Amino acid sequence: MISAMEQRVRHYWTLRSHDFGAVRKNELENEMGQKWLREIERLLPEKEHLRILDVGTGTGFFAVLLAQAGHQVEGIDLTPAMLEEARLLAAQRNLDIVFREMDAQALSYAEESFDVVLSRNLTWTLPEPEKAYREWFRVLKPGGWLLNFDADYAANVRSRMQNCKVAPDSPYGHIGMTDALQQENDEITLTMDIGQLRPAWDLRVLRRIGFSDCRSDATVGQRILGALDLTHAPMFGIWARKA
């Protein structure tokens, strides 16, 4: 049974699934996809065929990108409509990717199942992000890596609310969003426990859980998104190893 907040988040992403899928498909077909692949591959363990879990796969961007690179990838998401888009994207490229409906905070995988767990723009949506991090640690093999790309989106919302004269940052992934969906996005963001200073919060939690080599990189957004990155909430990368 998922919580009321998780139901709210799932409903929000259901409404956005089709347009969001179009954005991610376009990324795969332009230079954005190659930028992401280079960024991820420089962080991956030196092994040709990794078993990778894409948590919060959404419409399957990371899963497709890494499966095309020869890795064994599974993608999970809480929103069935997003998974439908992901399966379609994989089928169009003749890729054998397993997509499952699953809560990122309560994985149904056995311990030490994956070489890599990665995620993009997910942790900010989770009601219990520390619980999710503990689950991701559990399913990683010893020596495995966690890669998380996210942003302090609450900072962007707070900035807009505190200074209404300043034009808000608008993520390019929000193209076509209605005012009602934007308001829902803001309310969900500010409700989450993770609406605090990041990535410092994440690094503290990861070390407490037992990860080692915990690092963050605040320049990821500039390298990949360039001018499309948010001013008030730039994308950061986090990586940590399970000893």
Where are these regions (language model features)?
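A short acidic, Gly/Pro-enriched loop at the edge of an enzyme's catalytic core
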Residues: 105-116
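Class I SAM-dependent methyltransferase SAM/SAH-binding core
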Residues: 51-55, 59-106
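A short SAM/SAH-binding and catalytic strip from SAM-dependent methyltransferases
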Residues: 116-129
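Conserved class I S-adenosyl-L-methionine
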Residues: 1-48, 61-65, 145-179, 220
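Core SAM-dependent methyltransferase catalytic element
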Residues: 209-212, 226-243
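Short alpha-helix
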Residues: 193-210, 216
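A short glycine-rich, Lys/Arg-flanked "PGG" loop and its adjoining helix->strand segment in the class I
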Residues: 130-145
